[in-house]
Amino acid sequence: MQFSLALVTLLATAVSALPTEEKRQAYIPCSGLYGTSQCCATDVLGVADLDCGNPPSTPANATDFSAVCSAIGQRARCCVLPILDQGILCNTPTGVQD
């Protein structure tokens, strides 16, 4: 009886000493219909954005997405359909301040 109590106590101590694993979700700036992340220079009434391209690096969060695009003189956008460096139907990603 005492042996089993000692064994349970030992196992409980060992389990409580194990570090917890923290899993973080990857940042996905654009999803759904507006699923293409772009850095665009000019916004035309929210219908089209001019001089758009893919972000030069993968953003880690909304602030980083804005900073990555700002570093090349553009703004972070989520577009429906980028065609020939033009973003069609673009909006500002969640968490990004214009």
From Swiss-Prot:
User: Which gene specifies this protein's sequence?
Assistant: HYD5
- Official protein name in the record: Class II hydrophobin 5
Q: What does this protein do?
A: Aerial growth, conidiation, and dispersal of filamentous fungi in the environment rely upon a capability of their secreting small amphipathic proteins called hydrophobins (HPBs) with low sequence identity. Class I can self-assemble into an outermost layer of rodlet bundles on aerial cell surfaces, conferring cellular hydrophobicity that supports fungal growth, development and dispersal; whereas Class II form highly ordered films at water-air interfaces through intermolecular interactions but contribute nothing to the rodlet structure.
Q: Gene3D superfamilies this protein is in?
A: Hydrophobin
Q: Does the keyword Transport apply?
A: no
Q: Got a GO cellular component term for this one?
A: extracellular region
Q: Where does the protein principally reside? A: secreted
Q: Got any disulfides in this one, which pairs?
A: 30-78, 39-69, 40-52, 79-90
Location in or out of the cell: Secreted; Secreted, Cell wall
Origin: domain of life:
Eukaryota
Recite the lineage of the species: Eukaryota, Fungi, Dikarya, Ascomycota, Pezizomycotina
Q: Where is the signal peptide?
A: 1-17
Q: Which InterPro entries match?
A: Cerato-ulmin_hydrophobin (IPR010636), Hydrophobin_sf (IPR036686)
For this UniProt record, the keywords arranged alphabetically read as follows: Cell wall, Disulfide bond, Secreted, Signal
Question: After gene disruption, what is the outcome?
Answer: Does not affect pathogenicity in a corn seedling infection assay nor the production of microconidia.
Identify its protein family: Belongs to the cerato-ulmin hydrophobin family.
